[in-house]
Every structure is written in C-alpha cells, then in structure tokens.
Amino acid sequence: MEPAFGEVNQLGGVFVNGRPLPNAIRLRIVELAQLGIRPCDISRQLRVSHGCVSKILARYNETGSILPGAIGGSKPRVTTPTVVKHIRTYKQRDPGIFAWEIRDRLLADGVCDKYNVPSVSSISRILRNKIGNLAQQGHYDSYKQHQPAPQPALPYNHIYSYPSPISAAAAKVPTPPGVPAIPGSVAMPRTWPSSHSVTDILGIRSITDQVSDSSPYHSPKVEEWSSLGRNNFPAAAPHAVNGLEKGALEQEAKYGQAPNGLPAVSSFVSASSMAPYPTPAQVSPYMTYSAAPSGYVAGHGWQHAGGTPLSPHNCDIPASLAFKGMQAAREGSHSVTASAL
C-alpha cells in the first residue's frame, strides 16, 4: 500500500520525506528477510532504499519490534512541582546561587536521586522562566518600600528667572496691611508668550516693555507717530547752539585743525540766524498717493536766508582761494576768516 502523495526515489518507489515507512511494508521486509532473501534483493523487490531496509532489520533483531519511534518510551519528567518549589526556596535564600549548586543541594537534601535529578540546563531554564519574574517583582516591591518620600517640587526656573509681565503686574498690586507679601515668582504661575520668536522666548520684549514703563521720558508709540511734527519738540536753550553746548563748540573751533592743510571753516551758525523749519502739512494716514503736494518746499530747510548754493551758511570765503594749488592753500590758511563765529 503506497501513499497517494510523496516523492519518487531512485528505485521508482514513492516515499514521504520525514515520515516513517508504513507498517505493512515494514512487516513485508521482515518476512522476506526470514525467508533468507538478501537486503539488496528486498530493496529492489519492494522499491525501498537499501538503507531503510537495513535499519528496519537491525532494529527488529535488537528489540523484536517493527514499530517506529523511541525504544522504551520517553524519559520521565523530572521538573515536578516539588522540585520547582525547592529550587524557588534556594533562590530566595541565596539570590546569587548557581544552577550547579542547586543541583547539588537537591541531591544532598534527598529531593532527587541520581536518576531523576534535573540537569543544569533544566534548572537554568526553570530559574529563567518560572522564578525570574517572581524575583524581579520582589526586588521591585522592596525598592518601593525603601524609596524615600518625594520632595515638594520647586518653582520652575526659580534661580535664573527673568521678569515677565505677569510678575511685574503682581509686584505692582498693593498688599493689604497685616498680610505678608508673596514673591511674584510664587504668587502667580509662569505663562509662556503666545508667539515663538527669539525675543519672546528669551524675554527681551518683556524687559524692554518694563524699561519703557519705568523710564521718566515719554517714548511715543506707533499710534502717536502721525501726530508728531517739528513744533512738538521743545525749543533749544538760549545757551546752546543747535542743541549743543556753546562752550564745547568754542573749544572745538579753537583747537580744531583742518585735514590735508585745507582752511578750517566752521559750519555752525547761531540758532537766531537760522530760519525756522517749515511746518509739514498734516497728512491723513488714509490719504492716497494722488494727493496734491502742497507741503513740499522748493529749497532746503537748513539753508541760510542770506546764503548761496556755494555757501549755504553765509561764510566769507576769499576769492583768492578759488583756483589755488595745494601749496598756496597751505600758505593762505591763516588769512581765512569765519564770520559765523
């Protein structure tokens, strides 16, 4: 009786790889061998490999059985629950014990004899699979018991804290009498700015806002720029020239020297001799570019009333220096007069 599926060997017989030979063919091989037929002739007649015939006959001569499988059955189980319990006890008493030491203790305590004592590999497998998780759980429980109580959390960034608008507002709020003052970093929690720019992250904007609020000078905001003009600035002091100290100007004119040997001509004029700046026309911020240019002036606002394009500050420059060379300019540098001073 041949199976319906399998592979074909060199003799033309069909076999299934990894499966034992059917019992009917095994019995036929033994019967032909008892009749005195050689194994090679049995192999050709039954179309079974010569190695398979020899193996079956050798097993039959030794055991008297033609059935496949291990002889005498499997080895009895040695890792009984009692053995596992003793192994767990040894491991709990001495966590650093080795597998071969556990094997020797099982023999010494009479738990096992030399026939059913588990091997070192079996003990290691028991320690890894069945007792390892329990040991780890015990260590975790002991760690939780000895763990100290958590300390109260400190406020975030309490050492290197930069001022924020909220802390500044909290500092400005007056504290009622009889109540101790609470620091700003503890009274109100920190809130991060809405944007993620570098100035907001580093707190530069909040610092500049506080400086502008605490400074005695008024800094106009963007909304007030359109209403500012020349007339809004305060007039210069009588002892100042063009907003500068008169003493400093006289000292500079006294000790100042012209570079490259050119005559030194002071460009400073008194505030009384200058014409006032033309008042700019008030332009609406919503005006389009097609508005009439009524606020424009033909000349420069800083030009002197009696000056010329060549001498805007009405300085007396001698005509003899008009087309002189460099040497002549050096010789006549002491004859130059500055009427503006």
Curated annotation (Swiss-Prot):
InterPro entries: Homeodomain-like_sf, PAIRED_DNA-bd_dom, Paired_dom, PAX_fam, WH-like_DNA-bd_sf. Residues 82-130 are annotated as: RED subdomain. It is found in: Nucleus. Residues 4-130 bind DNA. GO terms for cellular component: nucleus. Its main location: nucleus. CDD domains: PAX. Residues 168-189 are annotated as: Interaction with KDM5B. GO terms for molecular function: DNA-binding transcription factor activity, RNA polymerase II-specific; RNA polymerase II cis-regulatory region sequence-specific DNA binding. Keywords: Developmental protein, DNA-binding, Nucleus, Paired box, Transcription, Transcription regulation. Transcription factor required for normal development of thymus, parathyroid glands, ultimobranchial bodies, teeth, skeletal elements of skull and larynx as well as distal limbs. This is Paired box protein Pax-9. The lineage of its organism: Eukaryota, Metazoa, Chordata, Craniata, Vertebrata.
